[in-house]
Each structure stands twice: as structure tokens, then as C-alpha cells.
């Protein structure tokens, strides 16, 4: 399940940047944007399944940290969607980019620090 979640995130980020480049070039990015929305569903479902598998075995404060990671992941998805919607309507996106980047850094840090991660920050 971890590999499916990571693959969904990688595809989601690729589709996000493709849709962003299409919108910023003035072309229609609706098809890519809709594909990205399907990836959001896969990301959320696989993330929730991972969270539920951890709840069964985690002890101590691990529930809290994985819950924080899940909330930050939802913020990343919300930030991605808000950036693309504002780009499609030709509105400023500075604050939304800030939300997206802060949430993405938090998710990456927690994902690499927590036990299911790669132990980069040990």
C-alpha cells in the first residue's frame, strides 16, 4: 500500500505541474486538471488506508504524528487545487503557493521521519 500511495503522490505532483504550466501558458488544462482530481481520490483513499493500518499497531504518540501528517497531506491537496483554480481564473496565487509549499515540506519531513519512512532525519 505504501508503494501505491507514493506512486499516486508522484503522479499527482507531475500532473499538478503539467496543469500549472498549461494554465500559465494560456492554454486549456481542464483535462489534466480533471485527471489530477482523480489522483486526489486515490491519494486520499490510500493515505487513509495506511493511517488505519497504523492505528492498529502504533503505540504512544504515533497516532498523533500520523494524524498530523494526514492533515498536512489534505492541506497539500487543497493547496494544489486552489493554485490551479486561481490560475484558471487569472487571480493572484502567492498566498496559496505559500500554503502549498509549507504543507508539502511538513508532509515530506513527517513522511521521512516517521517509522514507515526512510529514516533520513534520525
From Swiss-Prot:
- Keyword Membrane among UniProt keywords: yes
Instruction: Give the matching Pfam families.
Output: DUF1516 (PF07457)
For the keyword Transmembrane helix, the answer is yes
Membrane-related topology note: Multi-pass membrane protein
Family (UniProt): Belongs to the UPF0344 family.
In terms of InterPro entries, this protein maps to: UPF0344
Q: Chief location of this protein?
A: membrane
> Any stretches that span the bilayer, and where are they?
6-26, 38-58, 65-85, 92-112
- Would you name any one GO CC term? plasma membrane
Q: What is the lineage of its organism?
A: Bacteria, Bacillati, Bacillota, Bacilli, Bacillales
Protein name, as recorded:
UPF0344 protein BcerKBAB4_1054
List where in the cell it is found. Answer: Cell membrane
Q: Which UniProt keywords apply?
A: Cell membrane, Membrane, Transmembrane, Transmembrane helix
